[in-house]
């Protein structure tokens, strides 16, 4: 696989998805780590500070993972998008023309409420790209 998109929220499920994706990625390929946060228009945000805090947390989470992975034979890119997680994952996979989407089957983290569980089911149903759900 040359281009793999991993839905990542820091949960154990997303860590397992990342590990599986790393086994599948070709040398000199591209691995995209995508965190999806709610839109600031979402009712869960009382003020703009809460949105900015969550966005920074998502960026730091992925940056730390990339740092921990160290030098690889493939590129790793951070993506932080806002909106409905399943829709964002599906749209991003098409926009980036990835070969595979890899998601955890379940999990929970501070970002996890927006990424894991029913989201993977929706992505499997509606994505135009192949999807791997890791248990």
Residues of each region from the PLM?
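Small/aliphatic-rich secondary-structure junction motif
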Residues: 2-46
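Short conserved AdoMet
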Residues: 25-27, 70, 128
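Short glycine-enriched, charge-decorated loop/helix-capping segments at active-site entrances
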Residues: 47-53
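Structural beta-alpha unit
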Residues: 70-101
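Glycine-rich, Arg-bearing micro-motifs that act as flexible, cationic patches
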Residues: 103-125
């Amino acid at each position: 696989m040359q281009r793999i998109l991993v839905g990542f929220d820091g949960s154990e499920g997303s860590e397992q998805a990342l590990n599986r994706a790393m086994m599948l990625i070709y040398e000199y390929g591209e691995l995209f780590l995508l965190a999806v946060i709610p839109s600031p228009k979402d009712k869960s945000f009382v003020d703009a500070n809460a949105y900015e805090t969550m966005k920074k947390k998502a960026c730091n989470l992925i940056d730390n993972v990339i740092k921990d992975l160290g030098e690889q034979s493939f590129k790793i890119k951070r993506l932080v998008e806002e909106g409905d997680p399943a829709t964002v994952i599906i749209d991003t996979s098409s926009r980036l023309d990835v070969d595979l989407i890899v998601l955890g089957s379940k999990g929970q983290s501070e970002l996890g409420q927006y990424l894991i569980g029913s989201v993977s089911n929706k992505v499997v149903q509606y994505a135009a790209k192949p999807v791997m759900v890791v248990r």
